[in-house]
Amino acid sequence: MNKVVLLCRPGFEKECAAEITDKAGKREIFGFARVKENAGYVIYECYQPEDGEKLISELPFSSLIFARQWFVVGELLQHLPPEDRITPIVGMLQGVVEKGGELRVEVADTNESKELMKFCRKFTVPLRAALRDAGVLTNYETPKRPVVHVFFIAPGCCYTGYSFAHNNSPFYMGIPRLKFPSDAPSRSTLKLEEALHVFIPEDEWDERLANGMYAVDLGACPGGWTYQLVKRNMWVYSVDNGPMAQSLMDTGQVTWLREDGFRYRPNRNNISWMVCDMVEKPAKVTALMAQWLVNGWCRETIFNLKLPMKKRYEEVSHNLAYLQAQLDEHGVNAQIQARQLYHDREEVTVHVRRLWAAVGGRRDER
């Protein structure tokens, strides 16, 4: 199996292809990307027959920016007979996957695929039963075994394959299903909520998103991102010349500072989180984030970089490289992750976590 399917945001296939070609090449896994505009997916075809599995096991999925999900596949199954689509799919997967822990029947995230998704939901139950009978799936779901993927690109036309549960997105189609809270000031709140799900392991939430932490929201108006921090019982300094939603001010947890986010300097030294979603050139935002991290003004940050119309992968890569260079130059040990989230549009979201030596049981205490 020498092909890897990467799901992405429609319109960002070229960026996804450029990224996987670059990062696979650095690991000496060579191939070429098949790109169809606005398809919502890319196929990276490796030159060597076993390199598909090698790629999805060796390259950390968390290092990819534009891919929502990935899995290795074989040849395209076409003209599946409407009276029995199951038998050919089972036949393709037998001998390829043994005792998979989960089945996902998926489509690309496009308007054209919405009707197809209804079929996928109905088709999943009988297909799962058949794959269990054939030994392709275990009789129960388990995160310890590979995930079996059946990816429909058209009616009667699909790829079959698998991903590794420890190196993929845990979400169906790579999209966390989040509900917009009716009391949130803006829909942008879902960006930060999704970022927390993607970047922070669930078992670390109580420690890293703890009650009573201090946080700063730069460019906060009207308070979509502040809302997420308040919901987690943090004390928030919301920095913006524009007004904050009254519902947030009424909580008593928010201090509104009428200042420019680029000029604000914190007067506390125990700020755990700084978040930032400002409409500004990515280089300017990255320089500000580097300043906060180098000076130790916060422990973790999540921020958005607005993308230009062209060379978007190059722009993001350049800014992340600059940030890493600044941290290295000042001896700051940190983890950097970036992802174009489902709720992002022409932007990517970056998470940086400063790391200190462990003291007294805390993972990152100063």
Swiss-Prot record:
List the catalytic activities from the record. Answer: cytidine(2498) in 23S rRNA + S-adenosyl-L-methionine = 2'-O-methylcytidine(2498) in 23S rRNA + S-adenosyl-L-homocysteine + H(+)
Q: What is its EC number?
A: 2.1.1.186
Q: Where is the active site?
A: 306 (proton acceptor)
Q: Which GO terms describe its cellular component?
A: cytoplasm
- Identify one Pfam family in the record: RlmM_FDX
Which keywords does this chain's UniProt record carry? Cytoplasm, Methyltransferase, rRNA processing, S-adenosyl-L-methionine, Transferase
Q: Which GO terms describe its biological process?
A: methylation; rRNA processing
The source's superkingdom equals: Bacteria
What Gene3D superfamilies does its record include? 3.30.2300.20, 3.30.70.2810, Vaccinia Virus protein VP39
Gene Ontology MF annotations: S-adenosylmethionine-dependent methyltransferase activity
Q: What this chain does, per the record?
A: Catalyzes the 2'-O-methylation at nucleotide C2498 in 23S rRNA.
Q: What is this protein called?
A: Ribosomal RNA large subunit methyltransferase M
* Source organism of this protein record: Salmonella paratyphi B (strain ATCC BAA-1250 / SPB7)
